[in-house]
Amino acid sequence: MDAMQKTIEYTSVSRIAGPLMVIEGIEGIAYGEIVDITTPNGEKRTGQVLEAREDIAVVQVFEGTSELNTSETRVRFTGETAKIGVSKDMLGRIFNGAGKPLDGGPEIIAEKKVDINGYPLNPVSRNPPNAFVQTGISTIDGTNTLVRGQKIPIFSGSGLPHNMLAAQIARQAKVRGEGEQFAVVFAAMGITSEESNYFMDEFKKTGALEKAVVFINLADDPAIERIITPRIALTTAEYLAYEKGMHVLVILTDLTNYCEALREIAAARNEVPGRRGYPGYMYTDLASLYERAGRVKGKEGTVTQIPILTMPHDDITHPIPDLTGYITEGQIVLSRELNRKGIYPPVDILPSLSRLAGNGQGPGKTRDDHAKVISQAYAAYAEGRGLRDLVAVVGEEALTERDRAFLKFADAFEGRVVTQGVDEDRSIEETLDIIWELLTILPKSELKRVSDELIEKYLPKK
């Protein structure tokens, strides 16, 4: 777009539908271009081109289309894509979903402006995720180890304490090693004012805000803003990681609200719906977010992602968790059954998986016994869980002494390893030591997945 076109204001708005408006009689317009909008009463708003064909442009209005009409609304195409000003001064600040300060502080003086859509990384320029990220949560650090550069979602359900878990991870997460810089970028989408106040209070009272950048999009904010919030958060994370050499953990919650906004916008555009009404491009859209995690050759920093989503009706085959599972490297599943038992965090380790856990375990990363003792504990817990179903049918009297030991181990595992205080920050060494202590419940002959050397070194003597 040339300089002359940037000064032209169009009044040829032909239709307004939901958050979208259609402008006709234009030329030289590009997809993703930012639009300045002036309402009939002189208020300034911002939009983005969603579709450009021939002489027609479909524009999404970030602040909503209330008070706009087709006769008096003025539109100017800027020729620029959506950008955010980034700076290390963003650490310790809280912003709204569009990147405007929400904490009463001054505007950020940007070191540079960056396109919020990021830039595609050549796979050859990526390094495989490596090195341990400690969250202080035993069921993550121990059994589903998080690795720098990884993307691993948390699958939750309505009413489960995923917000509490997200805040705890944001407070406690750290990387090990001398002189390593660490930051958290936290983005909440479509949350209530009550949830927003909870997150802000948690970050402020614990001091976690000092190492964090927080973006909050409320449920009553425009759905369009929900689409750009995770992109702004990831752009900030990439800047801190690749230009400032920091290891950045990005927590995105709730991706279900993000996908609902995608569906709402697709419906307003009269697009042909895909599975359960979601747009057919939802897979590629989610991939454009998740694939921004990683390690880049020649760069010290890393971007690690924990997207959180609530599964509608606890259905793990729903399109949102289903497509997310194809793109990411595992999943952490919260269990309603464990939650009913009063267990926090209610992480069910059996369906949970970190496909890259091995990259963050072992000498120099965690401890030499990590992988083996977790394998042993996982197998024993799975057997104990299976025996509970048998007890429900035949009663505990029918069990052998061996079976009773595994049943006892499963109960103890949930009580000592899975169960953890909201403010309890466990090191990986503490987690592994607890597991070794619980393994004394089992006959030594059943410890087939750990070597005699490890048993001699770590198993407490009775």
UniProtKB/Swiss-Prot annotation:
SUPFAM superfamilies attached to this UniProt entry: C-terminal domain of alpha and beta subunits of F1 ATP synthase, P-loop containing nucleoside triphosphate hydrolases
Cytoplasm is among the record's keywords: no
Record GO cellular component, one term: plasma membrane
Signal sequence, renumbered to the chain: none
GO annotation terms (biological process): proton motive force-driven plasma membrane ATP synthesis
Membrane topology: Peripheral membrane protein
Predominant place of localization: membrane
Gene Ontology terms, MF aspect: ATP binding; proton-transporting ATP synthase activity, rotational mechanism
Pfam families: ATP-synt_ab (PF00006), ATP-synt_ab_N (PF02874), ATP-synt_VA_C (PF22919)
InterPro entries: ATP-synt_VA_C, ATPase_a/bsu_AS, ATPase_F1/V1/A1_a/bsu_N, ATPase_F1/V1/A1_a/bsu_nucl-bd, P-loop_NTPase, V-ATPase_su_B/beta
Assembly and oligomerization: Has multiple subunits with at least A(3), B(3), C, D, E, F, H, I and proteolipid K(x).
Name of the protein: A-type ATP synthase subunit B
Organism encoding this protein: Methanococcus vannielii (strain ATCC 35089 / DSM 1224 / JCM 13029 / OCM 148 / SB)
Gene coding for it: atpB
